[in-house]
Amino acid sequence: MLVSFVVLTVIYALWPLVSHLSRLWYIKDLLIIVLTLVLASLLLHLCRTTKVLQTRMQSGKAQKIWSWILLIVGVPYIISILLAPIMQITHMAINKIISMFVIALMAGVIEELLFRGLLFNSLLSFFYHNKNRLLIAGLISSILFGCMHLINLTHQPLQSTVGQVIFAFTTGIILIYLRLLSNNIVWCMVLHFFIDFKPVILTSNTGSHNISLVKVFLAVLPLMILAIICLWLFNRHYVQTNK
């Protein structure tokens, strides 16, 4: 499955080439939709299941407390993610909004099936005999998810890209935890879509070029730490439950 992950990730990374096949925006969007459907079908077949566990596991007391802390700390981020696009799209042409929707949908579906789906499942199988496999697989998949954004160095500055890697790693841990909590990948796709559904996704520089890396790191550090704690607590509770 790891070989399939690498091959499909490379194919997905080359999706911008599709935009050069036509100058008509609706043809470009249609081609992206077709690519999304094809890749999603292949990934769903390779993943075999969107579940992690046979049945959804109930959270332990400590995990519930830390999950609420993560949610409370994350509320400002959630509000900014939801409100920023609404404020901006009111001044955008309808074709730009449609293109933004299509690209965000592709990213939400394909990147989740790649990293929280195929890669995460593959790592769980690889570390099957390790009691901390949920934690290890979650961290590795999040690191690789962050590193995947290094491909943006081909069209944007180093500072923007590194900031994007830091943010993507943090987001990856949260999305892994969400998949474990829900025992499904659909909610990960929904959250990922809203994170990417913003005008900047249509530009060549999708990173944080006007914000210092120190500020980016400090901004996401609380979420990063809390998400890792929650992931560790979930893994610990899983081990205790399945002794």
Q: Which residue ranges define each predicted feature?
A:
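Helix-boundary and loop/linker segments of multi-pass membrane transporters
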Residues: S59-A62, Q88-I98, N130-K131
